[in-house]
């Protein structure tokens, strides 16, 4: 009898074969599933606490996606030779998995749940994020935890005007779209994408195509659960205290209505805090008078939050003004200023209502590119975008330091939005870093980073293909009534049913991110939302073009200049020198940065044009070939009885024989030459061994012949 109750499900999915299995590995976890897609193998595990911690008032879900270097047949770098802190890719993939799973846990479920996905084997052509998402969904489904899944996921590419399901990495490179969609049988829950200025209907078509194709994976998970699933947890939400609900509503509703008439964010937050405190104090006072135990503040806070949501959503669906007084389609006032910082290469201050981004662009050389040691192989990133949001941006105190998951995710979204409109490395050889410092935040700060990033790049002189703008949208749905909100505030983000961010140019979408919290949002609703987002994006693009018509034609005086020369690849070692000695001396003495590619292209960069010219001259001398008939200004290195060794170019010497110094017979070479003396010589012969024969006498004879030639009439 086997020790394991191993259940396996296999299915064909597009061009790929998928295998799901449970029951053999990690049996003490609440749920564990191995997913194998064409040799990319992940182990997804789920553990759920049997009870919530006392006083818990939120759902503590953590998702950790971990790539093991052995999966690609590698040993980790570093002193300890083991995996360390999560890479940016691991953080982004953890967020990608978290986003569609979180909305499917029932309201009031506060037990701690941890999802851990290990990448065990990697086929470089099959990205591990889709297997990881399917594995996490399947592990939750077999665990018996209260989870309204399963979730399916698919990657969609757009090649030759056709959608491609779960493309290989080679297909992604040729695609104008890289889109990941996740959802249940009935609804899309999450979209993450990067595109090359595609129209809205193509983007929506990709979402619908991906949702249709993921049903195959969802069906397989259902089959796995039927055969290998654990019993469902007997969990029931805590019964609602209707009397407490009614009393909180009676005490707080008028004050909350008044608070949401305040247009200024900080003043409104102050008023809301007062309402929360006053309501809790009143309830405690009543409990003392009645001799009962007062409701805990977390429960009261949740009731007040639900009441806030009901007020704001009701006002919007009834056609009343939004929190800040706008209608559903209006973008907040925009202010733009470029060239804000005097010594940076490019900068822009982009303000939209109470959201503000100070964005700075810096130009560097090839040596400044980010080297990424990914499982599928090492590669370089010439464009980096980093997003920072310090606590003062929302008027709060908090930790300042390394970027949090949210900051990494927002930075990647803004990068995706801009990358399609950057010039190629051949057109613009610089590496580029953009940093977005969020100085004020009230919703849509990642999209402010897109707008500010585009403007800062143009200010730096980067020849962008087009202006790029981004806008954050919201959606509220109640029954058959819905409202799409343009340029949402932070409060509208928290209280809505869907938030999605669209970035692009006048010609199409470059990035789309959707997070949907409820079932029932149809293709038609998404169509309306995308059309309204385009309207908002075009408005912002108009403001940006009014402020900055195009990229600066001149780089900042503080940005490095670059020149490129081509050398014989066989001469690269001469330029580098033993242990890098030659190139190190070159860079230090000329104040330049020098990059040499394997094909012999040498890039010299510096803010000092004289230093660049000197470095160029020296490299040309090092790599030059000695040619017969050419005249060189050489230096006498050594005197011999039969002649002198003369240095012509760095590392290249020749013999000036005693008979080739002057026309008369030379008895003592010291009468004519000294070590260190500059001497003009002509190359008269080279042989297959690289030996060079020189003559000074030949130049004397040529000069005499020219002197004897009568001038032409």
UniProtKB/Swiss-Prot annotation:
It is found in: Cytoplasm. GO terms for biological process: mRNA catabolic process; RNA processing. Pfam families: KH_1 (PF00013), PNPase (PF03726), RNase_PH (PF01138), RNase_PH_C (PF03725), S1 (PF00575). Residues 629-697 form the S1 motif domain. Mg(2+) binds at residues 493, 499. Its cofactor is Mg(2+). PANTHER family: POLYRIBONUCLEOTIDE NUCLEOTIDYLTRANSFERASE (PTHR11252), POLYRIBONUCLEOTIDE NUCLEOTIDYLTRANSFERASE 1, MITOCHONDRIAL (PTHR11252:SF0). It catalyses: RNA(n+1) + phosphate = RNA(n) + a ribonucleoside 5'-diphosphate. GO terms for molecular function: 3'-5'-RNA exonuclease activity; magnesium ion binding; polyribonucleotide nucleotidyltransferase activity; RNA binding. Keywords: Cytoplasm, Magnesium, Metal-binding, Nucleotidyltransferase, RNA-binding, Transferase. This is Polyribonucleotide nucleotidyltransferase. SUPFAM superfamilies: Eukaryotic type KH-domain (KH-domain type I), Nucleic acid-binding proteins, Polynucleotide phosphorylase/guanosine pentaphosphate synthase (PNPase/GPSI), domain 3, Ribonuclease PH domain 2-like, Ribosomal protein S5 domain 2-like. Its EC number is 2.7.7.8. Residues 560-619 form the KH domain. Belongs to the polyribonucleotide nucleotidyltransferase family. It is an enzyme of class 2 (transferase). Its main location: cytoplasm. The gene is pnp. It comes from Burkholderia mallei (strain ATCC 23344). GO terms for cellular component: cytosol. Involved in mRNA degradation. Catalyzes the phosphorolysis of single-stranded polyribonucleotides processively in the 3'- to 5'-direction.
């Amino acid at each position: 009898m086997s020790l394991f109750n191993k259940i396996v499900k296999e299915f064909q999915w597009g061009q790929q074969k998928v295998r799901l299995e449970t029951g053999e590995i990690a049996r003490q976890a609440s749920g564990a599933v191995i997913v194998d897609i064409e040799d990319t193998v992940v182990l997804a595990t789920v553990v759920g606490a049997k009870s919530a911690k006392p006083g818990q008032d939120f759902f503590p879900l953590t998702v950790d996606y971990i790539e093991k270097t052995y999966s690609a047949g590698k040993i980790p770098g570093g002193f300890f030779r083991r995996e360390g802190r999560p890479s940016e890719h691991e953080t982004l993939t953890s967020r990608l998995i978290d986003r569609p799973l979180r909305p499917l846990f029932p309201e009031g479920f506060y037990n701690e749940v941890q999802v851990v996905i290990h990448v065990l084997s990697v086929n470089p052509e099959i990205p591990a994020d889709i297997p990881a998402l399917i594995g996490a969904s399947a592990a939750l489904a077999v665990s018996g935890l209260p989870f309204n899944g399963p979730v399916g996921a698919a990657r969609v590419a757009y090649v030759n005007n056709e959608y491609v399901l779960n493309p290989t990495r080679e297909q992604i490179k040729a695609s104008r779209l890289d889109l990941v969609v996740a959802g249940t049988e009935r609804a899309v829950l999450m979209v993450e994408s990067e595109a090359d200025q595609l129209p809205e209907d193509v983007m929506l078509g990709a979402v619908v195509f991906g949702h249709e194709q993921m049903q195959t994976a969802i069906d397989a998970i259902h089959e796995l659960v039927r055969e290998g699933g654990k019993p469902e947890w007997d969990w029931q939400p805590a019964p609602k205290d209707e009397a407490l609900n009614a009393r909180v509503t009676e005490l707080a509703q008028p004050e909350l209505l008044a608070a949401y008439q305040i247009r200024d964010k900080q003043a409104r937050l102050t008023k809301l805090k007062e309402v929360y405190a006053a309501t809790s104090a009143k309830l405690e006072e009543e409990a003392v008078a009645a001799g009962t135990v007062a409701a805990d503040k977390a429960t009261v806070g949740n009731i007040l939050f639900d009441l806030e949501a009901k007020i704001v959503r009701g006002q919007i669906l009834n056609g009343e003004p939004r929190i800040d007084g706008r209608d559903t389609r209006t973008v907040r006032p925009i202010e733009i200023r470029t060239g804000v910082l005097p010594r940076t290469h490019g900068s822009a201050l982009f303000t939209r209502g109470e959201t503000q981004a100070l964005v700075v662009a810096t130009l560097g050389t090839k040596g400044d590119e980010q080297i990424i040691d990914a499982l599928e192989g090492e590669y370089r990133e010439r464009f980096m975008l980093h997003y920072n949001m310090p606590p003062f941006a929302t008027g709060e105190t908090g930790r300042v330091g390394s970027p949090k998951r949210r900051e990494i995710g927002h930075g990647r979204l803004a990068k995706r939005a801009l990358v399609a409109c950057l010039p190629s490395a051949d057109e613009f050889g610089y590496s580029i870093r953009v940093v977005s410092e969020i100085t004020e935040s009230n919703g849509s700060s990642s999209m402010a980073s897109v707008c500010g990033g585009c403007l800062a790049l143009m200010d730096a002189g980067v020849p962008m293909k087009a202006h790029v703008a981004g806008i954050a949208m919201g959606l509220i749905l109640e029954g058959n009534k819905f409202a799409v909100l343009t340029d949402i505030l932070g409060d509208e983000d928290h209280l809505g049913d869907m938030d999605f961010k669209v970035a692009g140019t006048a010609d199409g979408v470059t990035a789309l991110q959707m997070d949907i919290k409820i079932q029932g949002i149809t293709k038609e609703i998404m169509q309306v939302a995308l059309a309204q987002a385009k309207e908002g994006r075009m408005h912002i693009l108009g403001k940006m073009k009014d402020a900055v018509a195009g990229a600066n034609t001149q780089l900042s005086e503080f940005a490095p200049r670059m020149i490129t020369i081509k050398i014989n690849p066989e001469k690269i070692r001469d330029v580098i020198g033993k242990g890098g000695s030659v190139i190190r001396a070159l860079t230090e003495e000329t104040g330049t940065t020098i990059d040499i590619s394997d094909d012999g292209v040498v890039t010299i960069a510096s803010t000092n044009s004289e230093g660049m010219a000197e470095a160029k001259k020296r490299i040309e001398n090092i790599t030059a070939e000695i040619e017969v008939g050419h005249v060189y200004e050489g230096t006498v290195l050594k005197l011999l009885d039969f002649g002198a060794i003369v240095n012509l170019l760095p590392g290249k010497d020749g013999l000036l024989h005693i008979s080739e110094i002057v026309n008369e017979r030379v008895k003592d070479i010291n009468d004519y030459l000294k070590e260190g003396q500059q001497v003009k010589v002509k190359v008269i012969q080279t042989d297959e061994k690289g030996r060079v024969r020189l003559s000074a006498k030949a130049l004397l004879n040529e000069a005499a012949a020219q002197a004897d030639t009568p001038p032409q009439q």
